[in-house]
Amino acid sequence: MRAGACLLGAVIAGCLSQTSVAQEAPVSGYEFLLPETKALQDDDFANPGMLWVELGEELWQKQAANGTSCQSCHGTPEAMRGVGTRYPQWSETQGGIVSLEQQINMCRTERQQEPVFPYSSDELNGLTALVMHQSRGLPMSVATSGPAAEAIARGKDYYETRRGQLNLACTSCHVQHVGDRLRGETISQGQVNGFPIYRQLWQGMGSVGRMIAWCNDAVRAEPLAEGSQMAVELELYLRSRGEGLPIESPAVRR
């Protein structure tokens, strides 16, 4: 991954010498896709991300050693409609912001007495995609007041800070150069309403955390570890930034 990301980073540095006008209203990455990629996402029979949703359905019903399952506590997956729109969110018990992946793993350890699913594992991506898929079409609506406000401020600061050998911030691409061309593709706003996504470059499913790490690698910066406090707070900021955009998971991206 690093070789490809470094090559991309060099191209980014060249492209960002151009002048561009920022877009302020939230626009889904779907609007920047090629027609054939849009068609792939729109067709549930062809959308490869649905394979992870199906895996999530199997895991939802699977009993742990203590006899519990996601379904025994929560009912059918459809009962999760609306849940994904609110994550990441403040957790009183954890004393911090918790992502949906972390909530799933807390249920694993506390309710099912099972080990956590590793980040970026098919199992965790599958369950996350299943829960998010139930909210498809509903607007993202994370809490932005109270303790969440402080976390969002830290995420925003990270988003706007230049870093890495290329000295670029997230805003360098996803605010200042939205609509510009990079390696034959159009730079989007970097909205996260489609996550977890099936990314064609990865030939697999990926979380917001994985995407953040990949972008950091592309600008030759130290990647944030998935599940770290900063990564989760950055995701919260990103979801607040896209407030109102409809959930698309599992989206397909380049």
Which residues fall in each region the model found?
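C-terminal capping alpha-helices of c-type cytochrome domains
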Residues: 113-141, 211, 221-253
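Hydrophobic, ordered structural segments
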Residues: 57-64, 82-139, 159
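The canonical Cys-X-X-Cys-His
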Residues: 65-77, 127, 155, 165-177, ...
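Short cysteine/histidine-rich zinc-coordinating motifs and their immediately flanking basic loops
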Residues: 80-88, 182-188
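Electrostatic cytochrome c docking/interface patches
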Residues: 28-63, 133-163, 254
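Short Fe-S-cluster ligation motifs
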Residues: 98-115, 199-218
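N-terminal export/targeting leaders of redox proteins
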Residues: 1-42, 46, 55-58, 116, ...
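Acidic helix-start/capping segments at beta-turn-to-alpha-helix junctions
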Residues: 70-80, 87, 145-146
